[in-house]
């Protein structure tokens, strides 16, 4: 039954989520400590189509922190293009990489690096990124409701709280 709900959810979110221009993702820098393994990310970030790798640093978008430190147009384009390509490659999948707390980590990393990613983006790219964020927001909220208490991580709690705040939901 859970698989059925996931399939329905994926179909609904991929077709019917509309980008609300009133939702703002700028200046949401809440991350204080950086636990990114830069040596591991450096080993794959310059490879072609690295978004296809089954690597947790790719699937939770930890590479965004490395790209941000790399800076410049190269880092921005590398980040943005790989987010878009990763999403196109994985948006219809039901299980991996939409398991555990990967969705929550991705959402947190996208939000934290949003200003960096969009600094040289055109309107269409910003709209696409907002749609990707909203898919993650709805996915986090949906998965949080159906997760067993023992499966919830601190990333899930942060992402769920952030998701509800973004959507303006009452947290009571």
Task: Give the ranges of each region predicted by the language model.
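Aromatic-lined, polymer-binding surfaces characteristic
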Residues: 54-172
């Amino acid at each position: 039954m859970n698989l059925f709900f996931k399939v329905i959810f994926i179909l609904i979110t991929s077709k019917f989520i509309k980008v609300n221009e009133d939702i703002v993702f700028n200046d949401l820098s809440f991350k204080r400590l950086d636990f990114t393994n830069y040596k591991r990310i450096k080993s794959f970030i310059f490879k072609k189509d690295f978004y296809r790798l089954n690597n947790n640093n790719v699937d939770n978008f930890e590479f965004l922190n490395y790209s941000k430190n790399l800076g410049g147009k190269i880092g921005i384009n590398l980040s943005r293009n790989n987010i878009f390509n990763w999403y196109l490659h994985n948006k219809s999948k039901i299980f991996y990489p939409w398991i555990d707390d990967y969705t929550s980590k991705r959402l947190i990393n996208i939000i934290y690096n949003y200003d960096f990613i969009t600094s040289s983006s055109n309107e269409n790219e910003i709209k696409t990124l907002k749609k990707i964020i909203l898919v993650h927001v709805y996915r986090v909220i949906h998965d949080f409701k159906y997760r067993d208490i023992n499966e919830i991580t601190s990333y899930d709690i942060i992402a769920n709280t952030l998701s509800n705040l973004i959507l303006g939901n009452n947290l009571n």
